[in-house]
Protein backbone atom coordinates (compact mmCIF):
# COMPACT_ATOMS: atom_id res chain seq x y z
CA UNK A 1 0.00 0.00 0.00
CA UNK A 2 1.41 3.38 -0.98
CA UNK A 3 1.83 6.26 1.45
CA UNK A 4 -0.96 8.25 -0.24
CA UNK A 5 -3.42 5.33 0.02
CA UNK A 6 -2.56 4.82 3.69
CA UNK A 7 -3.21 8.52 4.39
CA UNK A 8 -6.63 8.34 2.69
CA UNK A 9 -7.56 5.22 4.69
CA UNK A 10 -6.49 6.82 7.98
CA UNK A 11 -8.42 9.97 7.06
CA UNK A 12 -11.62 7.96 6.41
CA UNK A 13 -11.27 6.04 9.68
CA UNK A 14 -10.74 9.20 11.72
CA UNK A 15 -13.70 10.86 9.97
CA UNK A 16 -15.90 7.84 10.75
CA UNK A 17 -14.82 7.89 14.41
CA UNK A 18 -15.62 11.60 14.66
CA UNK A 19 -19.08 11.01 13.15
CA UNK A 20 -19.79 8.19 15.63
CA UNK A 21 -18.69 10.37 18.54
CA UNK A 22 -20.90 13.23 17.33
CA UNK A 23 -23.83 10.83 16.82
CA UNK A 24 -23.48 9.28 20.29
CA UNK A 25 -23.24 12.77 21.78
CA UNK A 26 -26.45 13.99 20.14
CA UNK A 27 -28.30 10.73 20.94
CA UNK A 28 -27.33 11.09 24.59
CA UNK A 29 -28.47 14.71 24.62
CA UNK A 30 -31.84 13.83 23.03
CA UNK A 31 -32.43 11.06 25.61
CA UNK A 32 -31.55 13.44 28.48
CA UNK A 33 -33.93 16.08 27.12
CA UNK A 34 -36.86 13.89 26.05
CA UNK A 35 -36.44 10.62 27.98
CA UNK A 36 -35.14 7.13 27.31
CA UNK A 37 -36.53 5.58 24.12
CA UNK A 38 -37.28 8.92 22.45
CA UNK A 39 -34.86 7.93 19.67
CA UNK A 40 -33.40 4.52 18.85
CA UNK A 41 -31.98 2.37 16.11
CA UNK A 42 -34.75 0.45 14.38
CA UNK A 43 -32.92 -2.86 14.80
CA UNK A 44 -32.74 -2.33 18.58
CA UNK A 45 -36.46 -1.55 18.99
CA UNK A 46 -38.15 -4.75 20.13
CA UNK A 47 -41.46 -2.88 20.36
CA UNK A 48 -41.42 -2.43 16.59
CA UNK A 49 -42.26 -6.13 16.29
CA UNK A 50 -46.06 -6.03 16.06
CA UNK A 51 -47.93 -8.47 18.30
CA UNK A 52 -51.60 -9.23 17.70
CA UNK A 53 -54.92 -9.85 19.45
CA UNK A 54 -57.14 -12.60 18.04
CA UNK A 55 -60.43 -11.45 16.51
CA UNK A 56 -62.24 -14.63 17.57
CA UNK A 57 -62.65 -15.72 13.93
CA UNK A 58 -59.81 -17.84 12.52
CA UNK A 59 -60.58 -16.76 8.95
CA UNK A 60 -60.33 -13.07 9.91
CA UNK A 61 -57.15 -13.65 11.93
CA UNK A 62 -55.64 -15.13 8.79
CA UNK A 63 -56.80 -12.20 6.64
CA UNK A 64 -55.25 -9.71 9.10
CA UNK A 65 -51.96 -11.55 9.43
CA UNK A 66 -52.64 -12.76 12.99
CA UNK A 67 -55.33 -10.44 14.37
CA UNK A 68 -55.66 -6.84 15.56
CA UNK A 69 -52.18 -5.27 15.94
CA UNK A 70 -51.25 -4.18 19.46
CA UNK A 71 -50.44 -0.51 19.98
CA UNK A 72 -52.37 0.58 16.88
CA UNK A 73 -55.67 2.24 15.93
CA UNK A 74 -58.29 0.03 14.25
CA UNK A 75 -61.52 1.17 12.56
CA UNK A 76 -64.43 -1.21 12.00
CA UNK A 77 -67.27 0.17 9.89
CA UNK A 78 -70.35 -1.12 8.12
CA UNK A 79 -74.15 -0.83 7.88
CA UNK A 80 -76.50 -1.49 10.78
CA UNK A 81 -76.81 -5.06 12.14
CA UNK A 82 -73.71 -6.26 10.29
CA UNK A 83 -71.83 -7.55 13.35
CA UNK A 84 -69.56 -4.62 14.31
CA UNK A 85 -70.20 -4.75 18.06
CA UNK A 86 -70.14 -8.56 18.09
CA UNK A 87 -66.71 -8.49 16.46
CA UNK A 88 -65.29 -6.20 19.15
CA UNK A 89 -66.90 -8.12 22.02
CA UNK A 90 -65.09 -11.24 20.80
CA UNK A 91 -61.82 -9.26 20.82
CA UNK A 92 -62.53 -8.20 24.42
CA UNK A 93 -63.17 -11.83 25.39
CA UNK A 94 -59.86 -12.89 23.79
CA UNK A 95 -57.94 -10.17 25.69
CA UNK A 96 -59.55 -11.20 28.99
CA UNK A 97 -58.76 -14.90 28.36
CA UNK A 98 -55.08 -13.95 28.21
CA UNK A 99 -55.27 -12.01 31.48
CA UNK A 100 -55.55 -8.56 29.90
CA UNK A 101 -57.78 -5.62 30.80
CA UNK A 102 -60.34 -4.23 28.34
CA UNK A 103 -62.53 -1.12 28.35
CA UNK A 104 -65.73 -0.37 26.43
CA UNK A 105 -66.65 3.27 25.84
CA UNK A 106 -70.38 3.01 25.13
CA UNK A 107 -71.18 6.34 23.47
CA UNK A 108 -74.35 4.83 21.95
CA UNK A 109 -75.57 3.69 25.42
CA UNK A 110 -76.59 0.37 23.88
CA UNK A 111 -74.29 -2.28 25.39
CA UNK A 112 -76.16 -5.47 26.35
CA UNK A 113 -74.27 -7.14 29.25
CA UNK A 114 -76.25 -10.39 28.89
CA UNK A 115 -75.24 -10.72 25.22
CA UNK A 116 -71.65 -9.76 26.03
CA UNK A 117 -71.50 -12.49 28.70
CA UNK A 118 -72.85 -15.06 26.23
CA UNK A 119 -69.88 -14.31 23.94
CA UNK A 120 -67.41 -15.06 26.71
CA UNK A 121 -66.84 -11.52 28.02
CA UNK A 122 -66.11 -11.28 31.76
CA UNK A 123 -68.63 -8.50 32.39
CA UNK A 124 -67.65 -8.24 36.08
CA UNK A 125 -64.15 -7.05 35.15
CA UNK A 126 -64.97 -5.17 31.93
CA UNK A 127 -64.44 -1.42 32.28
CA UNK A 128 -67.48 0.43 30.88
CA UNK A 129 -68.03 4.15 30.37
CA UNK A 130 -71.16 5.86 29.06
CA UNK A 131 -69.96 9.43 28.47
CA UNK A 132 -72.21 12.47 28.08
CA UNK A 133 -70.17 14.21 25.37
CA UNK A 134 -67.64 13.33 22.69
CA UNK A 135 -64.94 15.34 24.50
CA UNK A 136 -65.56 13.37 27.69
CA UNK A 137 -65.40 10.04 25.82
CA UNK A 138 -62.10 10.81 24.09
CA UNK A 139 -60.55 12.23 27.27
CA UNK A 140 -61.44 8.98 29.07
CA UNK A 141 -59.88 6.99 26.20
CA UNK A 142 -56.71 9.10 26.43
CA UNK A 143 -56.39 8.60 30.20
CA UNK A 144 -56.94 4.84 29.89
CA UNK A 145 -54.21 4.67 27.24
CA UNK A 146 -51.79 6.77 29.31
CA UNK A 147 -52.25 4.46 32.31
CA UNK A 148 -50.50 1.63 30.34
CA UNK A 149 -52.68 -0.80 32.35
CA UNK A 150 -55.35 -1.32 29.67
CA UNK A 151 -54.74 -3.66 26.73
CA UNK A 152 -57.81 -2.89 24.60
CA UNK A 153 -60.22 0.05 24.35
CA UNK A 154 -63.35 -0.12 22.19
CA UNK A 155 -65.27 3.05 21.25
CA UNK A 156 -68.86 2.41 20.12
CA UNK A 157 -69.24 4.49 18.04
CA UNK A 158 -67.62 7.50 16.34
CA UNK A 159 -71.02 8.66 15.07
CA UNK A 160 -72.27 8.91 18.67
CA UNK A 161 -69.37 11.12 19.84
CA UNK A 162 -71.41 14.30 20.02
CA UNK A 163 -69.43 17.54 20.58
CA UNK A 164 -70.32 19.52 23.70
CA UNK A 165 -71.29 22.57 21.61
CA UNK A 166 -73.93 20.51 19.82
CA UNK A 167 -75.38 19.09 23.05
CA UNK A 168 -75.55 22.50 24.72
CA UNK A 169 -77.09 24.13 21.64
CA UNK A 170 -80.69 24.07 20.44
CA UNK A 171 -82.18 21.27 18.37
CA UNK A 172 -81.65 22.17 14.72
CA UNK A 173 -78.54 24.32 15.28
CA UNK A 174 -75.85 23.84 12.62
CA UNK A 175 -72.43 23.06 14.08
CA UNK A 176 -70.59 22.35 10.84
CA UNK A 177 -67.47 20.20 11.04
CA UNK A 178 -67.38 20.08 14.85
CA UNK A 179 -67.21 16.29 15.04
CA UNK A 180 -64.47 16.11 12.39
CA UNK A 181 -62.42 18.73 14.28
CA UNK A 182 -62.94 16.81 17.53
CA UNK A 183 -61.75 13.53 15.99
CA UNK A 184 -58.79 15.21 14.29
CA UNK A 185 -57.60 16.74 17.57
CA UNK A 186 -58.16 13.49 19.47
CA UNK A 187 -56.21 11.38 16.97
CA UNK A 188 -53.27 13.79 17.09
CA UNK A 189 -53.28 13.58 20.86
CA UNK A 190 -53.72 9.85 21.49
CA UNK A 191 -51.84 8.17 18.62
CA UNK A 192 -48.38 8.63 20.13
CA UNK A 193 -49.57 7.42 23.54
CA UNK A 194 -51.15 4.33 21.93
CA UNK A 195 -47.82 3.33 20.40
CA UNK A 196 -45.93 3.77 23.68
CA UNK A 197 -48.48 1.93 25.85
CA UNK A 198 -49.12 -1.01 23.49
CA UNK A 199 -52.87 -0.52 23.91
CA UNK A 200 -55.10 -1.33 20.92
CA UNK A 201 -57.96 1.11 20.29
CA UNK A 202 -60.87 -0.03 18.12
CA UNK A 203 -63.27 2.63 16.83
CA UNK A 204 -66.63 1.42 15.52
CA UNK A 205 -68.11 3.65 12.85
CA UNK A 206 -71.35 4.02 10.93
CA UNK A 207 -71.94 4.62 7.23
CA UNK A 208 -73.57 7.66 5.64
CA UNK A 209 -74.42 8.47 2.01
CA UNK A 210 -72.80 11.43 0.26
CA UNK A 211 -75.34 13.64 -1.51
CA UNK A 212 -75.11 14.11 -5.28
CA UNK A 213 -72.70 11.26 -6.05
CA UNK A 214 -73.55 9.90 -9.51
CA UNK A 215 -70.47 7.77 -10.13
CA UNK A 216 -68.49 5.76 -7.63
CA UNK A 217 -69.36 4.67 -4.11
CA UNK A 218 -71.62 7.19 -2.32
CA UNK A 219 -70.89 5.65 1.11
CA UNK A 220 -68.64 7.38 3.62
CA UNK A 221 -67.89 7.06 7.32
CA UNK A 222 -68.66 9.71 9.94
CA UNK A 223 -66.17 11.87 11.83
CA UNK A 224 -64.15 13.26 8.93
CA UNK A 225 -60.95 11.88 7.40
CA UNK A 226 -58.59 11.91 10.40
CA UNK A 227 -59.46 8.39 11.58
CA UNK A 228 -58.94 7.00 8.07
CA UNK A 229 -55.36 8.29 8.08
CA UNK A 230 -54.41 7.37 11.64
CA UNK A 231 -55.92 3.85 11.58
CA UNK A 232 -53.39 1.07 10.90
CA UNK A 233 -56.25 -1.32 10.07
CA UNK A 234 -59.68 -0.56 8.58
CA UNK A 235 -62.29 -3.32 8.33
CA UNK A 236 -65.43 -3.11 6.19
CA UNK A 237 -67.98 -5.62 7.54
CA UNK A 238 -71.18 -6.51 5.66
CA UNK A 239 -74.04 -8.96 6.11
CA UNK A 240 -74.21 -11.03 2.92
CA UNK A 241 -76.68 -13.76 3.91
CA UNK A 242 -79.30 -14.60 6.52
CA UNK A 243 -78.91 -18.13 7.90
CA UNK A 244 -82.15 -20.11 8.16
CA UNK A 245 -83.41 -23.50 9.30
CA UNK A 246 -86.70 -23.79 7.49
CA UNK A 247 -88.41 -20.47 8.19
CA UNK A 248 -86.45 -19.79 11.39
CA UNK A 249 -83.60 -17.27 11.14
CA UNK A 250 -80.72 -18.20 13.45
CA UNK A 251 -77.81 -16.04 12.27
CA UNK A 252 -76.06 -14.14 9.49
CA UNK A 253 -73.12 -14.73 7.17
CA UNK A 254 -70.71 -11.79 7.44
CA UNK A 255 -68.01 -10.73 4.99
CA UNK A 256 -65.12 -8.57 6.14
CA UNK A 257 -62.86 -6.76 3.70
CA UNK A 258 -59.52 -5.49 5.00
CA UNK A 259 -59.75 -2.04 3.40
CA UNK A 260 -56.43 -0.90 4.92
CA UNK A 261 -53.60 -2.73 6.67
CA UNK A 262 -50.21 -1.22 7.54
CA UNK A 263 -48.84 -4.37 9.20
CA UNK A 264 -49.77 -7.08 6.65
CA UNK A 265 -51.00 -7.27 3.03
CA UNK A 266 -54.36 -5.42 2.66
CA UNK A 267 -57.51 -6.12 0.61
CA UNK A 268 -57.97 -9.67 1.87
CA UNK A 269 -61.52 -10.91 2.45
CA UNK A 270 -62.78 -13.17 5.24
CA UNK A 271 -66.21 -14.70 5.77
CA UNK A 272 -67.73 -16.26 8.89
CA UNK A 273 -71.08 -17.00 10.53
CA UNK A 274 -72.51 -14.94 13.39
CA UNK A 275 -75.15 -16.87 15.35
CA UNK A 276 -77.85 -14.93 17.20
CA UNK A 277 -77.16 -15.03 20.93
CA UNK A 278 -73.89 -16.96 20.47
CA UNK A 279 -71.64 -14.75 18.36
CA UNK A 280 -69.04 -15.88 15.82
CA UNK A 281 -69.18 -19.58 14.94
CA UNK A 282 -65.57 -20.62 15.61
CA UNK A 283 -66.33 -24.18 14.52
CA UNK A 284 -67.79 -22.85 11.26
CA UNK A 285 -64.55 -20.93 10.60
CA UNK A 286 -62.55 -24.08 11.32
CA UNK A 287 -64.70 -26.18 8.97
CA UNK A 288 -64.33 -23.63 6.14
CA UNK A 289 -60.53 -23.61 6.44
CA UNK A 290 -60.34 -27.40 6.89
CA UNK A 291 -62.33 -27.84 3.68
CA UNK A 292 -60.17 -25.39 1.76
CA UNK A 293 -56.93 -27.04 2.91
CA UNK A 294 -58.36 -30.50 2.02
CA UNK A 295 -58.27 -31.79 5.60
CA UNK A 296 -62.03 -32.29 5.50
CA UNK A 297 -63.38 -33.29 2.08
CA UNK A 298 -66.84 -32.38 0.81
CA UNK A 299 -68.50 -34.49 -1.85
CA UNK A 300 -71.97 -33.22 -2.65
CA UNK A 301 -73.73 -32.64 0.68
CA UNK A 302 -71.47 -35.02 2.64
CA UNK A 303 -68.34 -34.05 4.57
CA UNK A 304 -65.69 -36.68 5.29
CA UNK A 305 -62.59 -36.82 7.47
CA UNK A 306 -59.88 -39.44 6.86
CA UNK A 307 -62.18 -41.29 4.47
CA UNK A 308 -65.19 -41.50 6.84
CA UNK A 309 -68.38 -39.47 6.45
CA UNK A 310 -68.90 -37.20 9.46
CA UNK A 311 -71.98 -35.20 8.48
CA UNK A 312 -74.53 -34.42 5.80
CA UNK A 313 -74.71 -30.68 5.25
CA UNK A 314 -72.63 -27.93 6.83
CA UNK A 315 -74.80 -27.48 9.94
CA UNK A 316 -74.74 -31.19 10.83
CA UNK A 317 -70.97 -31.33 10.32
CA UNK A 318 -70.47 -28.36 12.67
CA UNK A 319 -72.63 -30.11 15.30
CA UNK A 320 -70.57 -33.32 14.85
CA UNK A 321 -67.29 -31.44 15.34
CA UNK A 322 -68.62 -29.74 18.49
CA UNK A 323 -69.59 -33.16 19.87
CA UNK A 324 -66.21 -34.75 19.02
CA UNK A 325 -63.78 -32.32 20.62
CA UNK A 326 -60.73 -34.58 20.30
CA UNK A 327 -61.06 -34.75 16.50
CA UNK A 328 -61.98 -31.05 16.36
CA UNK A 329 -58.79 -30.11 18.24
CA UNK A 330 -56.75 -32.38 15.97
CA UNK A 331 -58.26 -30.79 12.83
CA UNK A 332 -57.60 -27.29 14.24
CA UNK A 333 -53.96 -28.17 14.94
CA UNK A 334 -53.48 -29.52 11.39
CA UNK A 335 -55.19 -26.46 9.84
CA UNK A 336 -52.94 -24.02 11.73
CA UNK A 337 -49.85 -26.04 10.81
CA UNK A 338 -50.79 -26.00 7.11
CA UNK A 339 -51.54 -22.28 7.17
CA UNK A 340 -48.22 -21.60 8.92
CA UNK A 341 -46.49 -23.45 6.09
CA UNK A 342 -48.25 -21.16 3.58
CA UNK A 343 -50.79 -23.59 2.13
CA UNK A 344 -53.07 -21.78 -0.33
CA UNK A 345 -56.63 -20.99 0.71
CA UNK A 346 -58.58 -20.23 -2.41
CA UNK A 347 -62.32 -20.09 -1.70
CA UNK A 348 -64.57 -17.30 -0.48
CA UNK A 349 -63.84 -17.50 3.25
CA UNK A 350 -60.23 -16.29 2.83
CA UNK A 351 -58.28 -15.08 -0.18
CA UNK A 352 -55.19 -17.15 -1.09
CA UNK A 353 -51.90 -16.81 0.72
CA UNK A 354 -49.41 -15.85 -1.97
CA UNK A 355 -45.80 -16.98 -1.86
CA UNK A 356 -44.17 -13.67 -1.05
CA UNK A 357 -41.90 -12.43 1.78
CA UNK A 358 -44.73 -10.47 3.45
CA UNK A 359 -46.39 -13.75 4.42
CA UNK A 360 -43.49 -14.58 6.77
CA UNK A 361 -45.06 -12.01 9.11
CA UNK A 362 -48.44 -13.76 8.78
CA UNK A 363 -46.90 -17.18 9.43
CA UNK A 364 -45.16 -15.95 12.59
CA UNK A 365 -48.37 -14.43 13.95
CA UNK A 366 -50.37 -17.59 13.19
CA UNK A 367 -47.76 -19.58 15.16
CA UNK A 368 -48.54 -17.34 18.14
CA UNK A 369 -52.28 -18.07 17.75
CA UNK A 370 -51.56 -21.81 17.56
From Swiss-Prot:
The subcellular localization recorded is: Cytoplasm
- Ranges for the region named Disordered are 1-20
Molecular functions (GO terms):
ATP binding; ATP hydrolysis activity; ATP-dependent DNA damage sensor activity; damaged DNA binding; single-stranded DNA binding
Major place of residence: cytoplasm
What GO biological process term is on the record, naming one? DNA recombination
Cellular component GO terms, alphabetical: cytosol
Report any Pfam family annotated for this entry: RecA_C
Binding of ATP occurs at 78-85
Q: Which keywords does the record carry?
A: ATP-binding, Cytoplasm, DNA damage, DNA recombination, DNA repair, DNA-binding, Nucleotide-binding, SOS response
* Family note: Belongs to the RecA family.
What this chain does, per the record? Can catalyze the hydrolysis of ATP in the presence of single-stranded DNA, the ATP-dependent uptake of single-stranded DNA by duplex DNA, and the ATP-dependent hybridization of homologous single-stranded DNAs. It interacts with LexA causing its activation and leading to its autocatalytic cleavage.
Q: Which PANTHER family match?
A: MITOCHONDRIAL DNA REPAIR PROTEIN RECA HOMOLOG-RELATED (PTHR45900:SF1), RECA (PTHR45900)
Looking up HAMAP family in the UniProt record yields:
RecA
* Annotated protein name in UniProt: Protein RecA
Record organism: Prochlorococcus marinus subsp. pastoris (strain CCMP1986 / NIES-2087 / MED4)
Source organism lineage? Bacteria, Bacillati, Cyanobacteriota, Cyanophyceae, Synechococcales
Amino acid sequence: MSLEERRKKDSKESSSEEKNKALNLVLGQIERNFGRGSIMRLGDASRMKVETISTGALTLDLALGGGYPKGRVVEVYGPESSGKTTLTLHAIAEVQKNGGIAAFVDAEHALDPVYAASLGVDVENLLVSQPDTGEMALEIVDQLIRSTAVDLVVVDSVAALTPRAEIEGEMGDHVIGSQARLMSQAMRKITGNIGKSGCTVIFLNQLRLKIGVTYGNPETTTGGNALKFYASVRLDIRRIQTLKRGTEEYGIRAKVKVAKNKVAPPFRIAEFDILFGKGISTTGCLLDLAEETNIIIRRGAWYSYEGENIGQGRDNTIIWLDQNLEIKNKVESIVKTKLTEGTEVSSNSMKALNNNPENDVIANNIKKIA
